[in-house]
């Protein structure tokens, strides 16, 4: 049973209109789409138009979904967002595609979350966009090494119990 769907941002590899449309119309009204607050409300209005319940997530505000389940959604860059989930047993932080790369960025997100211990971290394990032509192997290798350095910095500073490499099979 699906109760909630969250999308980090509007790009089609994260927010799939086809997938949402493929969900049976009879159960859409039982599912709440969670999405960061935006000025244009385009995603929220689209989902409402399909018959989903919707809930906008204000930036960095704790939202209690039920007695045992909370979340915080934070904006990252111009259009992306991260998601922090807690229940009475675990904490999970999804920072996939977010530019949380520097020590300063990591200190800020730790502060935003009250320096809570993260049990599970989801983060991108490789670069996700075009990095040179076929013959630019050195550039792609440098980008991959840079992404690994960023990932190491994230793991050293967030110190999750578990890490789930996420997305980006380039």
Region annotations inferred by a language model:
Residues 7-10, 29, 47-50, 58-62, ...:
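Short linear motifs at secondary-structure transitions and domain/linker junctions
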Residues 1, 56-128:
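Core dinuclear metal-dependent hydrolase active-site scaffold
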Residues 34-35, 103-170:
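Cap/insert and terminal regions of metallo-dependent hydrolase folds
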Residues 1-59:
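Active-site HxH/HxHxD metal-binding segment of metal-dependent hydrolases
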Residues 13, 90, 161:
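Glycine-centered loop/turn positions within well-structured domains
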Residues 10-15, 39-43, 62-64, 78-80, ...:
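Active-site environment of divalent metal-dependent phosphoester hydrolases
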Residues 17-25, 43-44, 82, 106-111, ...:
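Short amphipathic alpha-helical segments and helix-helix/interface helices
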């Amino acid at each position: 049973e699906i109760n909630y769907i969250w999308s980090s941002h509007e790009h089609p590899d994260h927010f799939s209109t086809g997938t949402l449309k493929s969900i049976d119309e009879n159960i859409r009204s039982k599912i709440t789409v969670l999405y960061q607050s935006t000025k244009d409300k385009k995603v929220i209005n689209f989902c409402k138009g399909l018959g989903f319940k919707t809930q906008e997530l204000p930036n960095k505000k704790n939202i209690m979904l039920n007695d045992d389940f909370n979340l915080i959604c934070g904006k990252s860059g111009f259009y992306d967002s991260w998601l922090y989930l807690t229940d009475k047993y675990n904490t999970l932080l999804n920072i996939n595609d977010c530019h949380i790369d520097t020590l300063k960025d990591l200190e800020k997100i730790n502060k935003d979350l009250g320096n809570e211990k993260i049990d599970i971290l989801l983060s991108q394990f490789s670069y996700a966009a075009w990095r040179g032509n076929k013959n630019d192997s050195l550039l792609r290798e440098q980008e991959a090494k840079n992404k690994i350095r960023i990932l190491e910095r994230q793991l050293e500073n967030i110190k999750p119990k578990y890490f789930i490499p996420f997305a980006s099979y380039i």
